[in-house]
Amino acid sequence: MATGVSGIPSLPDIPMLRNFRGTILHSSQYEDGEAWRDKKALVIGSGNSGHDIAQDLHSSGANVTLVQRSSTLIVNVEPSAQLPYALYDEGPSLTDCDLIATSIPLPLARKSHILLTEQAKNLDKDLLDGLRRVGFKLDFGEDGTGWQFKYLTRGGGYYFNVGCSDLIVKEEIGLVQFSDIAAFVAEGARMRTGETLAADLIVLATGYKGQEHLVRELFGNDVADRVGPIWGFGDGQELRNMFTRTAQPGLWFIAGSFAQCRIYSKYLGLQIKACELGLLPQARTGSHASRTAEQGQVDRAKTAALRKASASHTFLEPR
């Protein structure tokens, strides 16, 4: 399955929302802001989708307010968000960069990303200070590890600023905290101050459920329970059920950035070849949270499969 890190829209249970008489959309249903010119919109959620939709509505002439549910990591898309990829501009080949990036042990990678996040905060200081002034709640990931570790652990919780944050700082896009909303009413959101924030449209930019929910929907409870959680780090400090065998024979997962998929697709292919050659069991056994105990067997099988397949010209060796 190459369906991405996220799949099924996550719809929060907000009983009061049924009181609203306007239009309610999940971000996955949003298409264009033109229909909402001169209308009032509330966008609930402050991740990438929420910011992008708020900016699109604003550019289409809507009066927009962003509703922040929890603290969010904000980083300018240039240059700050690109800091983790600086190696790719320093001379090594693309293949070597991918290998270096994926071979760093997790504890060392965490320390590296803490330093990169501090560097990004310094680069984005003016923007971040401006967001704080208007009441935007910021965070920088667990232990300050930044956006990449948010992506690897939960697949969201950050925004690459391409202009929406600047509009919020300039108060061209409004900002309220979800905790300041007392109730949703027919006309919009009633604040705890007694004021009613009128709206014609409410967009739920509330994210997506993980791949395990899509597996349950497509293949049923037995397969989903057998496979377990997908993405996020397991006990073996690797992404769970990603680029490797799962407990369900024949079911494989690949997702992530080009940098991840370029190199891990080769390793995934080697494992499939090893299974086809009988060098590796078709399914992984044991806890879905960890594959540490089998890692040596997997590594040996990868090497053996590569040698055998390359010798018979039945598999393209990674370049």
What role is predicted for each listed range?
Residues 1-42, 46-48, 55, 59-70, ...:
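Flavin (primarily FAD) cofactor-binding/catalytic cores of flavoenzymes
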Residues 73-109:
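A catalytic-pocket lid/entrance helix-loop region that shapes and gates access to the active site
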